[in-house]
């Protein structure tokens, strides 16, 4: 969404200092606790081999299929390519409409990105949908027509903690419904995508 906001001239290059400052502030406790800068910068690359499953209780694309016996690396690469492609399409559509989107449109696009990225990426935990949950609540508060999207996204995320109540594939279908509904609202109201 930052790229779209820069294309719309709503952010300046100097605003990047806010992002950099936030990164430094979030790293400060670990630095004070004795972690090296190298360890902090390589934390995600160091974890790449730790998780080999396709989903870790996330209501995602991979929760819709039986992953037993699948080549997790091939499917994982497919999921990464799919997530990258969807993200590139959403960002390019937002850049194309820059300057002509409403605040609700920016909020919808901001919601679509974490919904789509986390839904299609492999090896996701349910907690990675928190940003989508928060943005769906913000969108519903701003635009009452988005209340069903909020209900679906939050229900799918919250239900992952009660696997005995709703199965993970059901939660994934609900999250997919939230993604599609947000996409349809964005396309209809903002002529994006």
Model-based region annotation:
Residues 1-21, 31-35, 131:
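Perimembrane helix-loop-helix junctions
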Residues 43-62, 92, 110, 143-193:
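Transmembrane helical bundles and short interhelical boundary loops of multi-pass, membrane-embedded
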Residues 19, 134-138, 173-177:
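Alpha-helical transmembrane segments of multi-pass membrane proteins
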Residues 47-120, 184-186, 190:
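Aromatic/glycine/proline-enriched transmembrane-helix motif characteristic
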Residues 1-6, 25, 116-129, 155-163:
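Transmembrane helices and adjacent periplasmic/lumenal helix-loop junctions
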Residues 20-55, 59-68:
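Transmembrane-lumen/periplasm boundary regions of multi-pass, lipid-linked membrane glycan transferases
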Residues 10-18, 22, 106-113, 129, ...:
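Alpha-helical transmembrane segments of integral membrane proteins
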Residues 2-10, 33, 91-100, 139-144, ...:
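Structural signal for the C-terminal ends of transmembrane alpha-helices
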């Amino acid at each position: 969404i930052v790229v779209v906001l820069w294309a719309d001239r709503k952010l300046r290059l100097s605003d990047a200092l806010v992002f950099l400052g936030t990164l430094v502030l979030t790293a400060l406790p670990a630095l004070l606790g004795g972690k090296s800068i190298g360890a902090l910068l390589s934390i995600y690359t160091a974890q790449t081999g730790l998780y080999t499953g396709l989903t870790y209780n996330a209501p995602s694309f991979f929760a819709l299929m039986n992953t037993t016996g699948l080549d997790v690396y091939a499917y994982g690469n497919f999921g990464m390519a799919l997530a990258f492609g969807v993200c590139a399409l959403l960002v390019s559509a937002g850049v194309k409409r820059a300057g002509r989107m409403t605040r609700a449109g920016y909020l919808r696009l901001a919601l679509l990105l974490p919904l789509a990225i986390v839904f299609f990426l492999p090896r996701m935990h349910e907690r990675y949908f928190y940003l989508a949950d928060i943005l769906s609540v913000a969108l519903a508060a701003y635009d009452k027509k988005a209340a069903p999207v909020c209900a679906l996204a939050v229900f799918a995320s919250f239900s992952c903690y009660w696997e005995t109540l709703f199965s993970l594939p059901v939660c994934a279908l609900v999250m997919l419904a939230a993604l599609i509904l947000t996409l349809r609202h964005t396309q209809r109201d903002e002529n994006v995508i």
